[in-house]
């Protein structure tokens, strides 16, 4: 049941992408929005898993050796920034795919 609700929620972007009267262009725009949503969802999901693993490893390392907690925290922040950068790159790609799609011009 949850998968069905998620499926219909994902297709809501396709329903809102319909402008009417554009011929085949509305299909390209619909698939651009759907692809952007799926890509951004996968990137955010993977980033969240990576951030959770990084935080768990940092907490475990600090619990085992409190003396290196500061160095581990700095390394964790760098890793978090790199993980978040991948999600931001996917967001930029999704925005480009939606608003400046070369197949729509």
Curated annotation (Swiss-Prot):
The keyword rRNA-binding does not apply. Keywords: ATP synthesis, Cell inner membrane, Cell membrane, CF(0), Hydrogen ion transport, Ion transport, Lipid-binding, Membrane, Transmembrane, Transmembrane helix, Transport. The chain crosses the membrane at residues 3-23, 32-52, 78-98. One of its GO terms (cellular component) is proton-transporting two-sector ATPase complex, proton-transporting domain. It is a multi-pass membrane protein. GO terms for molecular function: lipid binding; proton-transporting ATP synthase activity, rotational mechanism. HAMAP family: ATP_synth_c_bact. F-type ATPases have 2 components, F(1) - the catalytic core - and F(0) - the membrane proton channel. F(1) has five subunits: alpha(3), beta(3), gamma(1), delta(1), epsilon(1). F(0) has three main subunits: a(1), b(2) and c(10-14). The alpha and beta chains form an alternating ring which encloses part of the gamma chain. F(1) is attached to F(0) by a central stalk formed by the gamma and epsilon chains, while a peripheral stalk is formed by the delta and b chains. NCBIfam families: PRK08482.1. F(1)F(0) ATP synthase produces ATP from ADP in the presence of a proton or sodium gradient. F-type ATPases consist of two structural domains, F(1) containing the extramembraneous catalytic core and F(0) containing the membrane proton channel, linked together by a central stalk and a peripheral stalk. During catalysis, ATP synthesis in the catalytic domain of F(1) is coupled via a rotary mechanism of the central stalk subunits to proton translocation. This is ATP synthase subunit c. It comes from Helicobacter pylori (strain G27). The gene is atpE.
